[in-house]
Amino acid sequence: MLAVRNMKFGIFLLWWGWVLAAESTVHWPGREVHEPSKKGSRPQRQRRGAHDDAHKQGSPILKRSSDITKSPLTKSEQLLRIDDHDFSMRPGFGGPAIPVGVDVQVESLDSISEVDMDFTMTLYLRHYWKDERLSFPSTNNLSMTFDGRLVKKIWVPDMFFVHSKRSFIHDTTTDNVMLRVQPDGKVLYSLRVTVTAMCNMDFSRFPLDTQTCSLEIESYAYTEDDLMLYWKKGNDSLKTDERISLSQFLIQEFHTTTKLAFYSSTGWYNRLYINFTLRRHIFFFLLQTYFPATLMVMLSWVSFWIDRRAVPARVPLGITTVLTMSTIITGVNASMPRVSYIKAVDIYLWVSFVFVFLSVLEYAAVNYLTTVQERKERKLREKISCTCGLPQPRGVMLDSSYSDGEVNDLGGYMPENGEKPDRMMVQLTLASERGSPQRKSQRGSYVSMRINTHAIDKYSRIIFPAAYILFNLIYWSIFS
């Protein structure tokens, strides 16, 4: 029994000695031993520093793992063998032209500017082609979709918009670019673009005009020998949003065409056209231009019903209508380009201006003839000597252009109601008629002299409206 106990105690001492020996040779992570009284403390620190240096020099325990966000792109590039090919050359270089199909979905037609002669359109532009260099093995025949980062590493068609003034690819929240690759190498390249392009407009029938604009797509570097550009599904390649509308235009039609463009320095290129026809809404211009002009012409006719002696009433009315017509013409031309030909709206406005101006000239003629009439009447009164009691009277008929003073001079006749009559008969007897046999043979006869300049206003009340109505019938039958 005692021997067994001694053996157990010996085993325990051996185990304890082995533990102490292990603690003196093994460094425990995160544990620091401070024994300044011992001489072996400095070598221990040196060994610890050497141990840390070993970790700093590339110990696999502290090696940082690669960025997992970049690993799918790297695997995709390896799967597509991006580094094994030269993508600066087009697919099938040296062979026939590579066919590139295009389809477009118009998202919005933002604005049409007559002054700048351009339009702004936002669209989805999609390209279709086959590049066998991008083919990859796939058991489920699924395509791979990428963003714009891969576009910079492979070959894509170098399309541009002919006659464009400004264009950009949308980048909210990221670049609106998508690349989809099929296992057999077929590629779909789609991007969202806003472009402002030129549109040659003809304003000879403005605002009753119809405009046709085109957005032209073409390869910048590759001629028809290298790249064959075509609409993938014909007219069905162009899709539009049904909600597209413009404030001043009605979109009548969208259609596609394909033509060849020739450049003397480089050759022939395939060019795709997106054509759309716009018809202008006339109601806005009826309210803003035609109706005010017609109203001013009709207002100028009011002067024909005003007494020709009322100069303060007729003159300001004529001047006001002329100035208003000038303002309307100036306002219309300010919103239009300075073209060298006459527009339909110019014809209407200038003819209306002529009618207004003629109404002013009409009153000038009436006023002048009235003044001449008064001068003749004054001379006539001076030649006639008024002698009471002469048996043979001669009648002089005057119209309403006489004044109150003239009535007193001609005998003091005035109706009971106090109003001036349109005509009055003044009985005058010449002294030389009493003893003349020739005058006696003419007793009882009267000579009437009628001077009536008011007839010009009466004729103008009919001629001016009739002529303006005839002009409107001809104008709207031609331009509508």
Swiss-Prot record:
Inhibited by TPMPA, a rho-specific antagonist. Inhibited by picrotoxin, when forming a homopentamer. In contrast with other GABAARs, rho-1 GABAAR is not inhibited by bicuculline, when forming a homopentamer. Down-regulated by external protons when forming a homopentamer. One of its GO terms (cellular component) is postsynaptic membrane. Residues 1-21 form the signal peptide. Its main location: membrane. Disulfide bonds join C199-C213. It is found in: Postsynaptic cell membrane; Cell membrane. 4-aminobutanoate binds at R126, S190, E218. Keywords: Cell membrane, Chloride, Chloride channel, Disulfide bond, Glycoprotein, Ion channel, Ion transport, Membrane, Postsynaptic cell membrane, Signal, Synapse, Transmembrane, Transmembrane helix, Transport. Residues 39-48 have a biased composition (Basic residues). SUPFAM superfamilies: Neurotransmitter-gated ion-channel transmembrane pore, Nicotinic receptor ligand binding domain-like. It is a multi-pass membrane protein. InterPro entries: GABAA/Glycine_rcpt (IPR006028), GABAAa_rho1_rcpt (IPR008058), GABAAa_rho_rcpt (IPR008057), Neur_chan_lig-bd (IPR006202), Neur_chan_lig-bd_sf (IPR036734), Neur_channel (IPR006201), Neuro-gated_channel_TM_sf (IPR036719), Neuro_actylchol_rec (IPR038050). One of its GO terms (biological process) is chloride transmembrane transport. CDD domains: LGIC_ECD_GABAAR_rho, LGIC_TM_GABAAR_rho. Residues 31-67 are annotated as: Disordered. GO terms for molecular function: GABA receptor activity; GABA-A receptor activity; GABA-gated chloride ion channel activity; identical protein binding; ligand-gated monoatomic ion channel activity involved in regulation of presynaptic membrane potential; protein domain specific binding; protein-containing complex binding. Residues 22-281, 336-346, 480 are extracellular. It comes from the Eukaryota. Belongs to the ligand-gated ion channel (TC 1.A.9) family. Gamma-aminobutyric acid receptor (TC 1.A.9.5) subfamily. GABRR1 sub-subfamily. Three rho subunits (rho-1/GBRR1, rho-2/GBRR2 and rho-3/GBRR3) coassemble either to form functional homopentamers or heteropentamers. Rho-1/GBRR1 subunits can also associate with alpha-1/GBRA1 subunits to form a functional GABAAR. Interacts with SQSTM1. GABAARs subunits share a common topological structure: a peptide sequence made up of a long extracellular N-terminal, four transmembrane domains, intracellular or cytoplasmic domain located between the third and the fourth transmembrane domains. This is Gamma-aminobutyric acid receptor subunit rho-1.
